[in-house]
From Swiss-Prot:
<feature type="binding site">
    <location>
        <position position="118"/>
    </location>
    <ligand>
        <name>5-methyltetrahydropteroyltri-L-glutamate</name>
    </ligand>
</feature>
<feature type="binding site">
    <location>
        <begin position="439"/>
        <end position="441"/>
    </location>
    <ligand>
        <name>L-homocysteine</name>
    </ligand>
</feature>
<keyword id="KW-0486">Methionine biosynthesis</keyword>
<dbReference type="GO" id="GO:0008270">
    <property type="term" value="F:zinc ion binding"/>
</dbReference>
<dbReference type="InterPro" id="IPR006276">
    <property type="entry name" value="Cobalamin-indep_Met_synthase"/>
</dbReference>
<feature type="binding site">
    <location>
        <position position="673"/>
    </location>
    <ligand>
        <name>Zn(2+)</name>
    </ligand>
</feature>
<feature type="binding site">
    <location>
        <position position="607"/>
    </location>
    <ligand>
        <name>L-methionine</name>
    </ligand>
</feature>
<dbReference type="GO" id="GO:0032259">
    <property type="term" value="P:methylation"/>
</dbReference>
<keyword id="KW-0677">Repeat</keyword>
<feature type="binding site">
    <location>
        <position position="613"/>
    </location>
    <ligand>
        <name>5-methyltetrahydropteroyltri-L-glutamate</name>
    </ligand>
</feature>
<keyword id="KW-0479">Metal-binding</keyword>
<dbReference type="InterPro" id="IPR013215">
    <property type="entry name" value="Cbl-indep_Met_Synth_N"/>
</dbReference>
<keyword id="KW-0808">Transferase</keyword>
<feature type="binding site">
    <location>
        <position position="734"/>
    </location>
    <ligand>
        <name>Zn(2+)</name>
    </ligand>
</feature>
<dbReference type="Pfam" id="PF08267">
    <property type="entry name" value="Meth_synt_1"/>
</dbReference>
<feature type="binding site">
    <location>
        <position position="492"/>
    </location>
    <ligand>
        <name>L-methionine</name>
    </ligand>
</feature>
<dbReference type="Pfam" id="PF01717">
    <property type="entry name" value="Meth_synt_2"/>
</dbReference>
Length: 762
């Protein structure tokens, strides 16, 4: 009998209950008992939803108060000194949130948050563990064991989920001194042994150990460590399933297949070609879990196609076949049943986490009971849906396809080199040394959100809505003028999300009402869905930016989202390549850039926050991606005069290893996230002479803590050691949408003061 199981479920809730509870707790409006009650309710609801869908073995340990990697850090006692209790007490929820969000100066002298970065190539973020050379590990957090008891008390068959020891170490960074993280392995392994043995005592039969780094290019010493680690852990008296995802095992396939564990999960959505080899190499005693339902997208599974593989696998494996999503459903919205505004045709093409669990269960049942009436019915429905989607005229637009086919190499090149452009731009803009600016968005107040919501619901006329947004723009411009910022932004009050705002105005996108996924902590995003060929029917931002520019003599930046970020932060099509979708988006944005320039806007920022996120996990696949991603950016930015300055912004982008490709984008100014990593990103400039201007972020906007002027001066001086002062800009790490006005103004006052101090001492 094939078994249906799941690797993980979204934790935020159908209506983002976790987000609302977290934020109420942080504001002091909900106590810890209330927060914990919300968590218990969500876990119970999610386990029941999976069970009702037909999942036989439920994941436990996939719930996290902020991030699953942070949960593991607390579990192992990997708590930086600045967050440790002075009396040596065990960590609390307050400790967890302090590590994630930082502590303000008014509390215990202040402590900056841990670094946050992308979870592999997804739009989820994790808190990077900080390891010291003398790192000690101790079991310090009981959450996993408590949740196992919760689930068992509710009558569920459970499969606890833990991040494997090698993946956990790989994800962390060394602090204080440079050393080999593998040196910590012998200190860490006893904790895994303790955890596994405690789970066995709790009656757990199977544990899922996530080792996604097996889909990466691993150094030989890390490969060598695998067999030793799992030889040690095999002593624990419970069965172990190693879960790999986000890519193929490739050169790690033999290693993974032969680890001394009881089962292996592989991702057949991202890497279907690995199936025949793994089937041949898998020892005869092992379970093979096949991830055939896409855990990272919203499209309904082609059940017949998946069944072809599963039927073949079942002939070989029999009861050793498990059926699963490709990865945790953390990256999928919760429940399509909540969507009551989508048209029936589009809705029939989609599946969210609950529906994906149903698909997994149906596939397992189709193997076990192929003649069952519900199996026959659902498979017939699936065939009909796949046919309609493949032939729908809503998807294919000949005019868009013809324009993409007509793209020439010259279309993605500026007319002159940077040296010639920057001379004209400096003359026209007349900015001081160390020019100050922000990344784009300002705080989204409840009044702003209410105005947008009322307009969408028809409760506010268009004229009243425009005046409400104009009022917010006037407020943002006035504050920036008073602060003394040099290049201004309009604040983006009219934008709900940097992708959704544009996607709403492009043909080829569709929107959900409840398609939320977690980005980090309480931050949820609702990715737009690309379902067809993409084009821009009319200008999207010009009137707002023109209005803002009319309020000031200073330069006002036009603010756009770049093609790669639009693609990476949307749920993309599966029927055409990402490259084709990026080119369609680039042409639409190119038209907007030209319109902004024609309206008198001298600076246009095209954000590519997700540029590095698109990199394939395997380095051998990087060149092709970097070629089309940089070409897409240049395509949307190149049809302007020399005098028009093109900016781009990248956040959470560790791009030391792709700095040449960043330079190939040929943006006149790039702003990047650097403060959390203490300007570590700038190490790239020691070996590569980046030719254009750069604004390394001088403070972390993800924390409510207000940085001091002295901290920012120190970071800028550090940056000036690697980048000529005449090419340095001064800016925050990212947009200020999620912050409140008081902390925003206080931080920007200090930032402007830091820039002025550098000008005075330059």
């Amino acid at each position: 009998m094939a078994l249906a199981h799941n690797l993980g479920f979204p934790r935020i809730g159908r209506d983002r209950e976790l987000k609302k509870a977290q934020e109420a707790y942080w504001k002091g409006e909900l106590d810890e008992a209330g927060l914990c009650a919300v968590g218990r309710g969500l876990r119970a609801a999610h386990w029941q939803a999976q069970k009702a869908a037909g999942i036989e073995l439920l994941p436990v340990g996939d719930f996290a108060w902020y991030d699953q990697v942070l949960t593991h850090s607390l579990t192992f006692g990997v708590i930086p000194e600045r967050f440790r209790a002075k009396d040596g007490a065990k960590p609390t929820l307050q400790t967890l949130f302090a590590m994630a969000r930082g502590v303000s100066d008014s509390c215990c002298g202040g402590a900056h948050a841990q670094e946050m970065t992308k979870w592999f190539d997804t739009n989820y973020h994790y808190l990077v563990p900080e390891f010291t050379a003398d790192q000690q590990f101790a079991l310090s957090w009981e959450q996993l064991f408590e949740e196992v008891e919760e689930a068992k008390a509710l009558g569920h068959a459970v499969k606890p989920v833990v991040i494997g020891p090698l993946t956990y170490l790989w994800l962390g960074k060394t602090k204080g001194a440079d050393f080999d993280k593998l040196e910590l392995l012998d200190r860490l392994l006893p904790l895994y042994d303790q955890i596994l043995n405690r789970l066995a005592v709790q009656g757990v039969e199977w544990v899922q150990i996530d080792e996604p780094i097996l889909a990466l290019d691993l150094p030989q010493d890390w490969k060598n460590a695998y067999e030793r680690v799992y030889n040690i852990l095999q002593r624990a008296p419970l069965k172990k399933l190693i879960a790999t995802y986000f890519g193929g095992l490739e050169d790690n396939l033999g290693l993974a297949a032969n680890l001394p564990v009881d089962g292996l999960h592989i991702d057949l959505v991202r890497a279907p070609d690995q199936y025949p080899t793994i089937l041949d190499r898998l020892p005869a005693y092992k379970v093979l879990s096949l991830g055939v339902v896409n855990g990272r997208n919203v499209w309904r599974c082609d059940l017949e196609k998946a069944l072809e593989v599963l039927r073949h696998a079942h002939e070989r494996l029999g009861d050793r076949l498990w059926v699963a999503p490709s990865c945790s459903l953390l990256h999928s919205p919760v429940d399509l049943a909540r969507e009551d505004k989508l048209d029936d045709e589009l809705k029939s093409w989609l599946a969210f986490a609950v529906q994906k669990c149903q698909e997994v269960a149906l596939l397992a049942k189709a193997i076990n009971q192929p003649e069952a009436a519900d199996v026959v019915t659902v498979l017939a429905q699936s065939r009909a849906v796949q046919h309609r989607r493949a032939t729908s005229p809503r998807i294919h637009k000949p005019a868009v396809q013809a324009r993409v086919a007509a793209i020439k190499p010259a279309d993605s090149q500026r007319a002159t080199a940077f040296e010639q452009r920057i001379a004209k731009q400096r003359a026209g803009l007349d900015l001081p040394a160390f020019p100050t600016t922000t990344i784009g968005s300002f705080p989204q107040t409840s009044a702003i959100r209410l105005a947008r919501q009322s307009f969408k619901q028809g409760k506010l006329t268009e004229a009243d809505y425009v005046e409400a947004m104009h009022s917010e723009i006037r407020h943002a411009v006035e504050i920036q003028e008073n602060l003394g910022l040099d290049v201004l932004v309009h604040g983006e009050a009219e934008r709900n999300d940097m992708v959704e705002y544009f996607a709403e105005q492009l043909d080829g996108y569709v929107f959900t009402r409840f398609g939320w996924v977690q980005s980090y902590g309480s931050r949820c995003v609702k990715p737009a869905v690309i379902f067809g060929d993409l084009s821009r029917p009319k200008a999207m931002t010009v009137e707002w930016i023109k209005y803002a520019q009319g309020l000031t003599r200073k330069a006002m930046k036009g603010m756009l989202t770049g093609p790669v970020t639009m693609l990476m932060w949307s749920f993309p099509r599966e029927d055409v390549t990402r490259e084709v979708q990026a080119r369609q988006l680039a042409l639409a944005i190119r038209d907007e850039v030209v319109d902004l320039e024609a309206a008198g806007i001298k600076i246009v920022q095209i954000d590519e926050a997700a540029f590095r996120e698109g990199l394939p996990l395997r380095r051998s696949a990087w060149p092709h991606y970097l070629e089309w991603a940089t070409e897409a950016f240049r395509l949307c930015a190149s049809d302007v005069r020399d005098e028009t300055q093109i900016h781009t912004h990248m956040c959470y982008s560790e791009f030391n290893d792709v700095i040449e490709s960043i330079a190939a984008m040929d943006a006149d100014v790039i702003t990047i996230e650097t403060s959390r990593s203490d300007m570590e990103l700038l190490e790239a400039f020691e070996r590569f002479d980046y030719p254009n201007e750069i604004g390394p972020g001088v403070y972390d906007i993800h924390s409510p803590r207000v940085p001091t002027k002295e901290e920012m001066v120190k970071l800028l001086r550090k940056a000036a050691q690697r980048i000529p002062a005449e090419r340095l800009w001064v800016n925050p790490d990212c947009g200020l949408k999620t912050r409140a006005w008081p902390e925003t103004e206080a931080a920007l006052v200090n930032m402007v003061a830091a820039a002025r101090e550098l000008r005075a001492t330059a």
